[in-house]
């Protein structure tokens, strides 16, 4: 995906909510039907949840107030099968949203402080609630059944038990870097205006700082001409990187010139290998080109891959990401809103199914998020106009030092479509029905995309 990051600071309406929003429609080949969740059951599940989570645990005095059944706030349309149930907790404070159908994960959102105000709901929260209402109702109409992982969550909550891995937590320490000075000191200026490093370059640099790799570049030269800047940029990757001089945090007046030069050099080199399109209002680059550049110029392993979330089930995707973090490997992650305003950042930890995000904004908004609710309350350099970064998510997997004998992992996708002459292709097909070893047969394909790191 192409990620362009502007310099505008966007403040979002703050919602006191821990991001715990799971994918709402998970497919399975089970023959069982999904069931509606009545308010009585939802209340018991809410009590169980507050009782088993350390940060929300309450005493015997806890009371739950049923404040919203998920109906449309504007039209007040009532329904016998609400999409979700909202409870405020008293007197301790906090609230919880329980799904109205077990096709979705049971706890859509919760907070251990504050309260849920239906009448004064911020517009961004209204949008979230409308989206989840539509998706749950759509799943009902399509007779979608819950996945095994979702059914397990319901069973555990009904028992008042924590998930098997609920206590496991991984958090890797990463630099709190940003896109402005001193990070962009070497980035080109356009008409006298500085350009930000770009979120792609910043994410790469944070990962390389964590790895303290490479010791120096591969020796190759990367040359390209950005269309907006208009002049050729070129870097020969043969200089050592001064990891000991790079600070984890750069505060005004608390660093010297050599420390600024060290991080600015790394940032600029990451930008050039990404073929960054520098611009004063936002610098952008393609993740695939950036990953390719890490291998070619920064001595990272050829087995690195770019994976799309839509290719996996929720359980598979979580397993893939957690395996990386368990191995001590950071994940270069990206997503956009429905306006295709994207951002690249770093996943550096997880707790249950929430992931710790380093947004590349100097520490602003860093914290745990559900991947289905990557919508920080405040944003820094590279923020979008709202709607979070939940669309088109992808991840660079296998970011590690080059290993001898490793090879590229090619990923070729065959697509359906019509040619200009009207011929229909349905991916990779053959008319052969019997396959005999060492006997040739014909396959047919019309459209394909190379999702791999290398060109071929």
Where are these regions (language model features)?
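Surface-exposed patches in mature extracellular/periplasmic domains of secreted proteins
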Residues: 58-61, 213-224, 303-310
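Solvent-exposed loop/turn segments at secondary-structure junctions
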Residues: 93, 104, 206, 214-215, ...
């Amino acid at each position: 995906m192409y990620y362009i990051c502007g310099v505008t600071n966007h403040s979002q309406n703050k919602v006191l909510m821990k991001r715990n929003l799971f994918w709402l429609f998970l497919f399975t080949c089970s023959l069982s039907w999904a069931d509606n969740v009545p308010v009585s059951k939802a209340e018991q599940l809410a009590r169980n949840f507050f009782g088993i989570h350390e940060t929300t645990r309450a005493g015997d005095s806890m009371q739950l107030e049923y404040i919203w059944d998920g109906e449309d706030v504007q039209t007040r349309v009532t329904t016998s099968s609400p999409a979700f149930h909202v409870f405020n907790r008293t007197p301790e404070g906090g609230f919880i949203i329980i799904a109205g159908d077990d096709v979705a994960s049971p706890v859509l959102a919760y907070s251990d402080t504050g309260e849920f105000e239906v009448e004064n709901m911020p517009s961004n929260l209204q949008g979230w609630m409308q989206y989840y209402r539509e998706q749950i109702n759509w799943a009902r109409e399509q007779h979608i059944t819950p996945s095994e992982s979702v059914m397990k969550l319901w069973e555990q909550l009904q028992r008042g038990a924590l998930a098997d891995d609920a206590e496991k937590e991984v958090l890797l320490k990463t630099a709190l870097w940003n896109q402005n000075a001193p990070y962009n000191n070497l980035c080109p200026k356009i008409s006298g205006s500085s350009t930000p490093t770009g979120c792609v370059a910043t994410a790469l640099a944070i990962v390389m700082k964590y790895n303290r790799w490479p010791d120096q570049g591969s020796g190759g030269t990367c040359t390209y001409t950005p269309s907006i800047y208009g002049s050729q940029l070129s870097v020969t990757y043969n200089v050592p990187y001064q990891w000991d001089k790079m600070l984890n945090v750069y505060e005004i007046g608390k660093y010297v010139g050599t420390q600024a030069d060290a991080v600015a050099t790394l940032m600029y080199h990451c930008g050039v290998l990404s073929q960054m399109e520098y611009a004063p209002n936002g610098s952008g680059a393609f993740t695939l080109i950036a990953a390719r550049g890490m291998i070619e110029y920064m001595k990272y392993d050829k087995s690195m891959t770019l994976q799309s979330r839509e290719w996996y089930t929720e359980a598979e995707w979580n397993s893939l990401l957690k395996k990386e973090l368990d191995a001590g490997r950071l994940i270069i992650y990206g997503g956009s809103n429905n306006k295709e305003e994207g951002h690249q950042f770093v996943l550096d930890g997880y707790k249950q199914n929430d992931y710790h995000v380093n947004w590349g904004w100097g520490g602003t908004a860093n914290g745990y998020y559900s991947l289905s609710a990557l919508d920080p309350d405040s944003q820094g350099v590279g923020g979008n106009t709202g709607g979070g970064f939940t669309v088109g998510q992808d991840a660079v997997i296998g970011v590690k030092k080059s290993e001898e004998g490793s090879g590229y992992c090619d990923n070729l996708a065959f697509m359906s479509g019509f040619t200009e002459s009207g011929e229909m292709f349905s991916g990779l097909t053959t008319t052969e029905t019997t396959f005999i070893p060492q006997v040739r047969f014909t396959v047919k394909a019309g459209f394909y995309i190379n999702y791999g790191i290398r060109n071929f």
